[in-house]
Design a protein with these regions (language model features):
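Bacterial N-terminal signal peptides that target proteins for export
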Residues: 1-13
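Stable alpha-helical elements in mature extracytoplasmic
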Residues: 45, 49-57, 85, 94, ...
Length: 352
């Protein structure tokens, strides 16, 4: 059952419970070993890397752990929009590991006292994958969409998720607004008012705001909309499933960096902190990093990045969230009450 198919009246915690999947990977993780040891690890993740975890990463870790310790590992997996997943964990969903879209969502869990160690202390400051924000278009690009400004043309139908539930949606807004501030659109460089105007023009064309990036791209694959603002890897995964998917890389776009963290309070309660730590460490290994690239995600490991460089198009002006002052500043300017996003939406709602 996908999140989109659930009743909207369900709370994030109820959603997580409904979406828990027993992830057995290669099928060997369900029975006891010769010494009878079977352990369980619960992963709470955002929607985008579902295939990467379920089909590649988790089975590989199960084999790794079995060879190292003789123990079988059974995974329970929950996939929601990043913000919804973070709120579910804070609200009582006992994930041992959180793999989310943005560090602000991990920080929300830390502020609730559930993460007690410095989750950024590991390799790559706690980041496990990268991507970029791109524009998915119809085969042959019949609408002639080439950059951010094109998404604001009257008459277009655009898809992007809801920023209240989706980390991907927040990345999308940061990409468009940041590109405008940097002179990567028709807006004059450094002109915040013009950047806000462009964001409004694009949001005016948004037809559907789904709960997560995965639901958004699935609707696009079903024929809804002319374009979708999305993670690059979502389009690449769609191609793997047989979709005739194309995308445009804006000349200026943001580098997406996705964090992972052990939820200390839950792992301690479940007696599996060693297992959770080992899984997070495994995600940084060359084996796992290569597996992520097989599902369209860009690696954080520089050696692996060099190996797969030809798979991913270059970006003329690639910036990071740090260029917007970091997540606390981006949230204050863009997503806090009275911020850019709220002002734009209020203005659009006030239009006849």
């Amino acid at each position: 059952m996908s999140p989109a198919s659930l009743s909207p009246a369900l709370s994030p915690l109820a959603l997580c419970c409904a979406l828990l999947l027993s992830g057995c990977g290669d099928g060997a993780g369900t029975g006891p070993t010769s010494n009878g040891a079977v352990r369980t690890l619960t992963l709470g993740a955002y929607t985008t890397p579902r295939e990467a975890y379920g089909k590649a990463i988790i089975p590989a870790f199960q084999r790794h752990w079995r060879e190292k310790t003789g123990e079988e590992v059974r995974f329970e997996e929950s996939y929601l929009g990043s913000g919804a997943q973070a709120r579910a964990i804070v609200g009582g969903f006992e994930a041992d590991v959180a793999a989310l879209s943005l560090e602000a969502d991990v920080e929300a869990i830390a502020r609730a006292g559930l993460i007690q160690r410095d989750w950024r202390a590991g390799p790559h400051r706690g980041m496990v994958t990268r991507s970029i924000v791109v524009i998915a278009v119809r085969p042959g690009n019949p609408k002639g969409i080439h950059d951010w400004d094109d998404l604001g043309r009257p008459g277009l139908d655009v898809l992007t998720p809801n920023v209240r539930t989706s980390g991907g949606a927040m990345w999308n807004v940061c990409a468009l607004y940041g590109a405008a501030l940097r002179g990567g659109t028709s807006a004059p460089k450094g002109d915040a008012a013009a950047a806000e105007t462009l964001l409004g023009a694009v949001l005016k064309n948004v037809r559907i705001m789904d709960k997560g990036a995965r639901e958004s791209i699935v609707n696009f694959e079903k024929g809804v909309g002319d374009a979708a603002i999305t993670y690059e890897n979502e389009v690449l995964v769609a191609r793997q499933s047989g979709q005739d998917s194309e995308y445009v890389v804006p000349r200026s776009t943001i580098l997406i960096e996705n964090p992972v963290a052990v939820i200390d309070a839950n792992a301690e309660k479940h007696g599996n902190r060693d297992l959770a730590d080992a899984f997070v460490a495994f995600l940084a290994s060359p084996q796992a990093q290569r597996a992520f690239t097989d599902y369209g995600l860009r690696p954080v490991d520089e050696t692996v990045a060099a190996e797969v460089r030809d798979r991913f198009p270059a970006v003329q002006d690639l910036f990071s969230i740090r260029d917007l002052g970091g997540w606390p500043e981006a949230i204050r300017i863009l997503f806090a009450p009275g911020g850019v996003y709220e002002r734009v939406v209020a203005s659009l709602n006030a239009q006849p």
